[in-house]
Amino acid sequence: MPCKDNQFNQRNLSQKILLLSDTHGYVDEKILTYCQQADQVWHAGDIGDPEVMRKIESVAVVRAVYGNIDGREIRNQYPLDERFFVEDVDVWITHIGGYPGRYEPRVREQLKLNPPKLFVSG
């Protein structure tokens, strides 16, 4: 769905972002090549195995959240939600967020109170 915020659409954003989700313990070598070409890699949860993130972090700057299949080690390293700014764009990443009309209750409340410009849900 296209963004309806004209200011956001008309920006000349310069960063290349690679968005991943649901790797479930596997990352293909081709993906690592794309990671090297990105300014940042965002992983929206269900990492599956800490080795996946070690591989990605060895070649890229990473922001990540844990997902519902992730164990203690991953949950200790990554948050449930990641909220940050990139090039003045307010970004919120979470794994289980839902979609318009069917957002998770905790997500729906935050979207009403403090909506980001960009919402990423794994």
Task: Report each predicted region and the residues it spans.
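Short intrinsically disordered, low-complexity coil segments enriched in acidic
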Residues: 1-2, 120
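N-terminal active-site segment of His-dependent metallophosphoesterases
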Residues: 2-62, 70-93
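Conserved beta-sheet core of the metallophosphoesterase superfamily
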Residues: 63, 99-122
